Amino acid sequence: MLRSLKALKLNSLNAQKGIRQFCSDSKISGQVIGIDLGTTNSCVAVMQGAEARVLENAEGGRTTPSVVAFTEDNQKIVGLPAKRQMVTNAENTLFATKRLIGRRFDDPMTKKDMTMVPYKIVKGPNGDAWFEVKGKMISPSEAGAMVLQKMKETAETNLGGPVTDAVITVPAYFDDSQRQATRDAGTIAGLKVQRIINEPTAAALAYGFKKDEPKTVAVYDLGGGTFDISILEIVGGVFEVRATNGDTFLGGEDFDNALLEHFVAEFKKEKGIDLTKDTMATQRLREAAEKAKCELSSTLTTEINLPYISAGPSGPVHFNMKLTRSKFEQLVADLIQRTIGPCNICLKDAGLSTSEINEVILVGGMTRMPKVQELAKSTFNKEPFKGVNPDEAVAVGAAIQGGVLKGDTKGIVLVDVTPLSLGIETLGGVFTRLIKKNTNIPASKTDTFSTAADGQSEVEIKVFQGEREMAVDNKLLAKFTLFGLPPLPKGVPQIEVTFDIDVNGMLQVIAKDKATGKAQQVRIQTSGGLSKDDIARILKESEANAEVDRKRKELVEARNNGESVVYQVEKDLVEFKDYLSQPQTEEIKKAVQAVRDVLAKEDGSAIEAEIKKLHDLTRSSFETAYKAKLDSSASKSSSTENKENKDNTTEAEFTEKK
């Protein structure tokens, strides 16, 4: 155990040094995409010239559902196709996985989540929360990586080439382990994560880009799974965060669950049937809840109709319910109220009153709800600004930051903060802070400590993050031991502990005995997360799966091509039947059948080979037949024209001159 001494040295980086370090990235050659990895939906954008462009996915959407599914034949599907099959495959479909990224299995929030989702949440190898799908363990970082891969593919399709560099956003109130887990997800997805930035900061960047007027803004960000509130000063291209607060387990998913519980309770009261025992019925209700929630943002009432939701003694039972906006607001009133506390704390930490806030920016899909807008207005005593797209602003801001890092976008500087205090456990279990919450990052601080007992030859250093006064009540990030201390009386050894937090908000801790010079350091990674070996293994599996996916895609494309070719050839056979010989027709039909036969096989190369044979065979035959048909048509046309001319010929009248 360590004993606190008076700090001998303070190395907090001043704002200007932080700015220089923030902008001193090495030159990036390729495009840098900005990704909003959301709980419910994700979005990707890129700077093109002086503007940020949101990129559309293969389905034509500007946002992509953060959903990953595994089908009966173990095929992985991501995004909208995965969401569409959730009802029939709920147990093998992962959604809202961001809520568990970097969380321990025994975390109360994990236990709560286990009661709300149809898939299995299990204890991972190091005590963190993982998922089990079809007997396979999947970490939240892996699930996030699958969504990030989808966003990467979307960018590559739109930009016409490979993309490797990205800026990824996280909730401002994410702790160190959650940030590290998000970076791991990016690495697994094959991305070089150039920067992790906070979602409200990114949204403020999207709002303030190309605006010259100095402003103090509050970003009220209520998304699918998290709530953040950040207060920033925007002056001359410098976006400086004054304070941030939030709740990493409050968002649209909770609103959906409140509606779901209401539906289940009402149906049980009316019909006497508990729908929670039917996974498919529950998933249908969940989707209906999400739809009703969205509709009630623009209408005062909606109707939920789900035929054949269950069966009773007398036959099928249907679900029919009318829901008013007023009733919905009653059901989620406590959730909306939970955003007030963080807002007030954020104002206090920033040292500002509501009158000093020039603009309140609404971000996140849930801010479309009128009651949420009313609360934001009453909390800050001003009408919220609704001029940014709540679903796209974060990705746009990340793309702008990508342009800054690449060197293409000038005059923009972000100065962010660490959301929670960082420190170590000292004598008596006290949490001794080294870096306080809302400290500008990057930052470094060194404090000196000593031993708590005589003759200690080693000390264990436990690193925590949080705001409680006792270490045990905060989140343990890491622990390590400094060995080889001289056996001196307690209080004599001087041990320097240095906390370095980088621009991504990630922490490195160094402990050093001043007398011997012996030191030990640890780069914090998620306490129950992925080691370098884990990431390497997952990357290897991902590469192997990528090859399988590529072959499967080639097979599907070959089959589609084969079916299209067969259809066209059979159509041409009918069209040119009068211009092909019997042997030619029979030979072509035989080749068509060969393609049909091979389509049932799992061999794309064989399919393409048979298609080529059919092409080679029909090319000359159909060309000859086509010319013959043209000649025949021309001949008939000429014959008809001559006949018409003959029919139209009249004898000239003349008078013989005498």
Swiss-Prot record:
Q: Which CDD domains match?
A: ASKHA_NBD_HSP70_HSPA9 (cd11733)
One GO location term (cellular component): cytoplasm
Where does this one sit in the cell? Answer: Mitochondrion
The biased composition feature labelled Low complexity covers 631-640
For this UniProt entry, the molecular function terms from Gene Ontology, in alphabetical order, are: ATP binding; ATP hydrolysis activity; ATP-dependent protein folding chaperone; heat shock protein binding; protein folding chaperone; unfolded protein binding
Recorded hits in Gene3D superfamilies, A to Z, give: 1.20.1270.10, 3.30.420.40, Actin, Chain A, domain 4, Substrate Binding Domain Of DNAk, Chain A, domain 1
Q: Which Pfam families match?
A: HSP70
Which InterPro entries does this entry report, sorted A to Z? ATPase_NBD (IPR043129), Chaperone_DnaK (IPR012725), Heat_shock_70_CS (IPR018181), HSP70_C_sf (IPR029048), HSP70_peptide-bd_sf (IPR029047), Hsp_70_fam (IPR013126)
Q: Name one GO biological process term.
A: chaperone cofactor-dependent protein refolding
Q: Which domain of life is it from?
A: Eukaryota
Annotated region (Disordered), positions in chain: 629-658
Q: Does the keyword Nucleotide-binding apply?
A: yes
Write out the biased-composition intervals (Basic and acidic residues).
641-658
Q: Say if the entry is tagged with keyword Oxidoreductase.
A: no
The protein's role, per its UniProt record: May function in protein folding and assembly, and disassembly of protein complexes.
- So what family is this one in? Belongs to the heat shock protein 70 family.
Name-wise, this protein is Heat shock 70 kDa protein, mitochondrial
- Lineage of the organism: Eukaryota, Amoebozoa, Evosea, Eumycetozoa, Dictyostelia
Gene behind the chain: mhsp70
